[in-house]
Structures are given as C-alpha cells and as structure tokens.
Amino acid sequence: MAPGSVLSLAVALATIIGISCTATVDETMRWKECLNTNQSIFDFQIETLQGEYTDLSQYRGKVILLVNVATFCAYTQQYTDFNPMLEKYQAQGLTLVAFPCNQFYLQEPAENHELMNGLTYVRPGNGWTPHQELHIYGKIDVNGDNHHPLYEFVKESCPQTVDKIGKTDELMYNPVRPSDITWNFEKFLIDRNGQPRFRFHPTAWSHGDVVTPFIEQLLAEPAN
C-alpha cells in the first residue's frame, strides 16, 4: 500500500460506516485509586513520532495525565477538552502524555508520520493542533503479549475500573487479562514523583470535570 494510503483509507471508512467507540455515556464513578509502588514511570523509555527514543524522566516534577488515544473513535473529541485543561493548569505543572494505539477495533490505523494530519484534518479536525503541554508519542500496544512495559507497570499498579472489559471481537490482541486497558482514552493520573495515583475509565470524563478534582489534588502536593 502506498505511503499515506493507510490514513486515507481510514478516513474513508470512518466517513462511510461511522466508526465510533462502543459507548459515549459518561460514568463518573468509574475510577480507582492506585496501589503504592517503589517504581515510577520515569524508569521507562518511549518512542517519539519521529522514531527517536527518550524517557519519561523529562517530566519529573510535573503532574501527568497519561492517555491511550485513537483518531477514529467517538472519544477522540476529548482532544478538544485537553487543550483548555492544559491551558488552565500548565503553570501549576500539568502535562499530558498520549500514546496512540490500534488495539481497539482498529481505530488508529495510521503510521506514526500520519498521525498528526489525522488529528488536524479528520478528528477532531478543523485545524486542531495540540497544546504545547500535550505530548503525543509513537504507537504502542497497551494490552496483550506485546504490551509496552510502561503500560504493564501502570496496569499492575492501578485496579481495574469495571467488571467487564469489552467484546472480544472488538479487541485486537491476545491474551485478554482482567487488568487490561478497556478502550481508547483510558487515563492514569501520575504525581510529581512519577507514581500512578488514579485510574479512569474512558467514560469517566464529562469534558474533564470528573478528573479535574484529582488533578488539583496532585498539583497541590509537593514533589519529594
């Protein structure tokens, strides 16, 4: 398939058959407090959209909202909430780290070099660009045999938010585990020391109102 055709095909499919997430209702109580751990997210290396490797220690001292994302999902409109949230809290130390993933109904088919065009021109579209504190990295697996070590860590550290993960025919990975990420736009809130503190189901959002009190709590805490 020619370069760029993957994204073009995905745009066409989204237009024709209306690809969306399995649910769009907010469930404000779908969150859990994480367990204490001696490890931190600063121990993990990640890949940029340009194929270079870096680590998360560059965000030491910040409160981090960690999100797995996808372009062709109803929850992609949450991107339009991210920028105002970051604008409000960036001076206090909030940043957002996003990892595209194609494991949920193949809703992120683009290659790394195509991802930003998908966000700008398709969903959320209308020329959307990320806030300077919204950092989008290369595609990863968040579940299954090849899940990224970062996600293995945060899933082990934070209890599951729901009893049922989803339909197996919509999950593009194996094996399915009880701790798995449930869908696109699941979130982990990380404190200034790199410790996972709270886990939020994708539906626990309500334009950010569900997560905001927890963000403010962690912003008020000093780094060790």
From Swiss-Prot:
GO cellular component: extracellular space
Cellular location(s): Secreted, Extracellular space
Gene: gpx-3
A GO MF label: glutathione peroxidase activity
Name of the protein in its database record: Glutathione peroxidase 3
Catalyzed chemical reaction(s): 2 glutathione + H2O2 = glutathione disulfide + 2 H2O
Biological process, per Gene Ontology: response to oxidative stress
Domain of life from the UniProt record: Eukaryota
Enzyme Commission (EC) number: 1.11.1.9
Signal peptide limits: 1-18
Annotated catalytic residues: 73
